[in-house]
Amino acid sequence: MIIESIIISSDLSGLVNFAPFGIKKKDDLIFISPYFPSKTLENLQINKYASVNYTDQATVFVDCLLGKKKFKTNQCKKNNSFFLQDSLSHDEVEVVEYIHDEVRPTFRCKILNSSINNRFKGINRANNSIIEACILASRVKLLEKEKIFNELKYLSIAVEKTSGEKELQAWNKINE
């Protein structure tokens, strides 16, 4: 199963990067598979620590995709990284293995600490559609335009029916 998350990693100078990622989880391990090239890939190769953040706020995914990465963070407890203050929960991880691949290598990461940060308040269908639109936007070079437009048209149904003001603004941003 793929779980949508926000990975926070940093380079050796401490510059933090926020990236939306579909990760895989098994027991006390998390598998992160970034495409070449990516800042997350670079950071995890040189700094073995990161956090995997779980949020129900689709606006975070949109802002990451659009490069508006000004989020409140706190220091992790068990590694030299940060986590999203507004996330529902997060896992603090350490890279224990690098599995090489020409297109999409994998970092096998051990979970050092898991924390619950905020209460889950329920599911809004518009958020799911917005996250799916972000995934489509990140794959513009890989997918046919017609497929993307058809998917967005379908996803817009849930946004139109169920979104609040914040979700509608995020939807409009991702569709610009």
Regions found by a protein language model. Name each.
Residues 1-90, 94-176:
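Basic, polyanion-binding surface patches
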